[in-house]
């Protein structure tokens, strides 16, 4: 019976060890499950925080872009208003230029009385002054520039008249600030 008791004790101690091991494994498994659950619970919180931060960054970027776009729109609008203001008299100037040409032709006629000539000169001068106040000026005719002159005829160049010099002006050209209203019609030495 002593052998039986030894075997029973041994078996009992082995089964207690197995139970302890099982219990330890269960405790470890439970702790691991709890830890995993805690981590899983923490992950969504971090994800929600990260998502909120990402959305905040996205909204901030959208705001900054919209703000920059508004500034660009305001700048372009201001530039357009300035351009409109600067060139507001362009159509009027183009309409007046033929009248100015007619006054020039009338003054070139021979046999005008002094009073008529003086009246035409005063009218011409007042038109020119009004156009100058709006920024309209005559195109210079020193040498030929295809940006401001239209060659209607060419003459052969010689020693006295170098190439690209202007021989005669048929019609004066005008510009409004830097914008050409009408090119000067000229005869050019070529």
Swiss-Prot record:
Protein name per the record: Protein GrpE
Function: Participates actively in the response to hyperosmotic and heat shock by preventing the aggregation of stress-denatured proteins, in association with DnaK and GrpE. It is the nucleotide exchange factor for DnaK and may function as a thermosensor. Unfolded proteins bind initially to DnaJ; upon interaction with the DnaJ-bound protein, DnaK hydrolyzes its bound ATP, resulting in the formation of a stable complex. GrpE releases ADP from DnaK; ATP binding to DnaK triggers the release of the substrate protein, thus completing the reaction cycle.
GO terms for biological process, alphabetical: protein folding
Homology family: Belongs to the GrpE family.
Gene that this sequence comes from: grpE
Listed HAMAP family: GrpE
Quaternary structure note: Homodimer.
Record-level Gene Ontology MF annotations: adenyl-nucleotide exchange factor activity; protein homodimerization activity; protein-folding chaperone binding; unfolded protein binding
Any one GO cellular component localisation term in the record: cytoplasm
Lineage, highest ranks first: Bacteria, Bacillati, Bacillota, Bacilli, Lactobacillales
Subcellular location as annotated: Cytoplasm
Keywords of the record: Chaperone, Cytoplasm, Stress response
Main localization of the protein described in the UniProt heading: cytoplasm
């Amino acid at each position: 019976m002593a052998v039986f008791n030894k075997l029973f004790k041994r078996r009992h101690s082995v089964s207690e060890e197995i139970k302890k091991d099982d219990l330890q494994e269960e405790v470890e498994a439970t702790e691991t499950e709890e830890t995993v659950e805690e981590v899983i619970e923490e992950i969504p919180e971090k994800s929600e925080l990260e998502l909120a931060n990402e959305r905040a960054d996205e909204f901030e970027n959208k705001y900054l872009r919209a703000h920059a776009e508004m500034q660009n729109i305001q700048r372009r609008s201001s530039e357009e208003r300035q351009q409109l203001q600067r060139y507001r008299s362009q159509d009027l100037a183009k309409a007046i230029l033929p009248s100015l040409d007619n006054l020039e032709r009338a003054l070139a006629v021979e046999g005008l009385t002094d009073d008529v000539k003086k009246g035409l000169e005063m009218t011409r001068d007042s038109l020119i002054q009004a156009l100058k106040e709006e920024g309209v000026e005559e195109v210079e005719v020193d040498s030929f520039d295809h940006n401001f002159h239209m060659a209607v005829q060419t003459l052969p160049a010689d020693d006295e008249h170098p190439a690209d010099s202007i021989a005669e002006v048929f019609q004066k050209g005008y510009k409004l600030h830097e914008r050409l209203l009408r090119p000067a019609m000229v005869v050019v030495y070529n």
